[in-house]
Amino acid sequence: MNMLNYQVVGITDYEPAVEFALYTRQLLFPEIYHGQIPKDLQNFEQFYVHDPLGCFITVKDQNRIIGTIAYRVYDHRFDLNLPSNTVEVVKLFVLPEYRRKGIATQLCNMLFSHAKNSAITTLYLHTHPFLPAAEEFWTLQGFEVIQREWIDTYDTIHMSKSL
C-alpha cells in the first residue's frame, strides 16, 4: 500500500468526495437509495465547507478516494437531549480492500482533532446492527450508546462522545 493522503475537503475539490459518498450510500442502503441525493450532498459547500460546524475528510491512495468521514451540524431530528452545538458524525466508509489497516481509526482521529480545534464539545452519530462491527468500532473510538430504537425499517443505535 502506498502512502495515503488524508485531507480536509475544500471548495475546489469536493466533487469527487460527493461522488464517493453517493457510491457508498448506494452500497450500504440500496433499498432507500432510489437515486435521491441527500440534502447535505446537494449543498456540500453549505454543510461541509462554509459552516464552522462542518468538516469532510477524505483519504486517498494516489488520486483515488478510498475512505471518508465527516461531521455536520446536528439537526436534533431525534429526541435525544443533546447540547445545542452538537455535530453529527456521518459518511464513515473505507473501501473493503483497505479495511482492517487502521484507516477508519486514523480518519476518526483527524476528525476529532478538527472538531476540538473548532471548539466542538459533543459528537453524535447513529448506526445500525446490520453494519458489521459498527457499534464495537465506535465504542473503541470513545462513543457511548445513549439510546436504541426502531425507526422505519432499521434498528438504530444512537451514540455520543464528549471531547
List the predicted regions and their residue ranges:
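Charged, amphipathic alpha-helical coiled-coil/dimerization segments
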Residues: 85, 100-101, 106, 123
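C-terminal "cap" of GNAT-fold acetyltransferases
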Residues: 23-24, 121-163
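Ser/Thr-centric signal marking residues that sit
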Residues: 68, 105, 127
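Acetyl-CoA-dependent GNAT
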Residues: 8-90, 95, 108-110, 114, ...
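Conserved GNAT acetyl-CoA-binding A-motif
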Residues: 108, 115-126
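Active-site acidic-Proline motif in GNAT/NAT acetyltransferases
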Residues: 95-97, 101, 129
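Extreme N-terminal starter segment of soluble prokaryotic enzymes
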Residues: 2-6
